[in-house]
Amino acid sequence: MTMAANDFPFQCQEKKSYSQPSLVYCNGNIAETYLEEKVLTAPLDYLRALPSKDIRSGLTDAINEFLRVPEEKVLVIKRIIDLLHNASLLIDDIQDSSKLRRGVPVAHHIFGIAQTINSANLAYFIAQRELEKLTNPRAFAIYNEELINLHRGQGMELHWRESLHCPTEDEYLRMIQKKTGGLFRLAIRLLQGESASDDDYVSLIDTLGTLFQIRDDYQNLQSDIYSKNKGYCEDLTEGKFSYPVIHSIRSRPGDVRLINILKQRSEDVMVKQYAVQHIESTGSFAFCQNKIQSLVEQAREQLAALENSSSCGGPVRDILDKLAIKPRANIEVE
């Protein structure tokens, strides 16, 4: 979804001067000048201007086929999620020492680390202020719960990387539920809070969040498009314990080659190609594809149970069709 710049109003429209003539106040806050606003939001605006899959916005619209929330409330929720998603990407790129995002230099390589962190933090609070436009009295509590979940998940992923600890599959799936699932869940919980429907779509959204992350892990190591947008096998350079990497390492407990490649944080293409071949040899890409297909089928079953006799599930099914990857036959491993 493309949003206009004024969808994120940082300047105040109604201004009241107090005793200090050089300052302008609005709702207890000192209002920014236009120049100040552009400086503060520059890293965020830079990222938001780049092409994006915008799957969270599309999924919000798809679920709203069931919930029938008024469009003005849907736009508020989309605005909140867009701000949080892009702010989290700014921070992720710093924490992961990334070089590319969506095919261009990461924001902190343009604006610096300090200014990028400040812009991301500001976005969290601008998003929080948008909650005032919703009617659900629990909106603020839901917002806090899911942002705490997101940071807990991110913290565990950082811990595994920095301590070179390979998590179990179950540990990784729990982390996904918190980190990746957080914004998916926040959007739908806020949407449900504005709806007259009593149906609960959180379980379906949890499945979709897990599906999205595992598919992203797979594509990072297998997709030419991902290589162009983020760099070749960037997850290996970051030292990330992604889903196929975890399966590969744990399928051969005595083989330390892959975990040592992660330790090096190598940018050498040949080293990363060797790692990809190793992951392939353990059947981990096939395992990942089969997991993706299993999650797609699980989501379709959950959708059918929610749909009953209505035909509201078409947009969600379209999203699932796009996320599906044809399973591979089991290959012979070394």
UniProtKB/Swiss-Prot annotation:
UniProt remark on cofactor binding: Binds 3 Mg(2+) ions per subunit.
Gene3D superfamilies: Farnesyl Diphosphate Synthase
EC number per UniProt: 2.5.1.-, 2.5.1.1, 2.5.1.29, 2.5.1.10
Keywords tagged on the record: Magnesium, Metal-binding, Transferase
Binding sites annotated in the UniProt record for Mg(2+) 3: 216
Catalytic activity: isopentenyl diphosphate + dimethylallyl diphosphate = (2E)-geranyl diphosphate + diphosphate; isopentenyl diphosphate + (2E)-geranyl diphosphate = (2E,6E)-farnesyl diphosphate + diphosphate; isopentenyl diphosphate + (2E,6E)-farnesyl diphosphate = (2E,6E,10E)-geranylgeranyl diphosphate + diphosphate
GO BP terms in the entry: alcohol biosynthetic process; isoprenoid biosynthetic process; mycotoxin biosynthetic process
Amino-acid positions noted as binding Mg(2+) 1 in the UniProt annotation, renumbered to this chain: 92, 96
Swiss-Prot/TrEMBL induction comment: Expression is down-regulated when the stress-activated mitogen-activated protein kinase (sakA) is deleted.
UniProt binding sites for isopentenyl diphosphate: 53, 56, 85, 102
GO molecular function, one term: geranylgeranyl diphosphate synthase activity
The protein's required cofactors: Mg(2+)
Residues annotated as site: Important for determining product chain length: 124
Pathway: Secondary metabolite biosynthesis
InterPro entries linked to this entry: Isoprenoid_synthase_dom_sf, Polyprenyl_synt, Polyprenyl_synt_CS
Transferase recorded as keyword: yes
Annotated binding of dimethylallyl diphosphate, by residue: 101, 179-180, 213, 220, 230, 240
Binding site for Mg(2+) 2: 92, 96
Cited CDD domains: Trans_IPPS_HT
UniProt superkingdom: Eukaryota
Family: Belongs to the FPP/GGPP synthase family.
Protein purpose: Geranylgeranyl pyrophosphate synthase; part of the gene cluster that mediates the biosynthesis of lolitrems, indole-diterpene mycotoxins that are potent tremorgens in mammals, and are synthesized by clavicipitaceous fungal endophytes in association with their grass hosts. The geranylgeranyl diphosphate (GGPP) synthase ltmG is proposed to catalyze the first step in lolitrem biosynthesis. LtmG catalyzes a series of iterative condensations of isopentenyl diphosphate (IPP) with dimethylallyl diphosphate (DMAPP), geranyl diphosphate (GPP), and farnesyl diphosphate (FPP), to form GGPP.
Name of the molecule in the record: Geranylgeranyl pyrophosphate synthase ltmG
Natural source organism: Epichloe festucae (strain Fl1)
Gene: ltmG
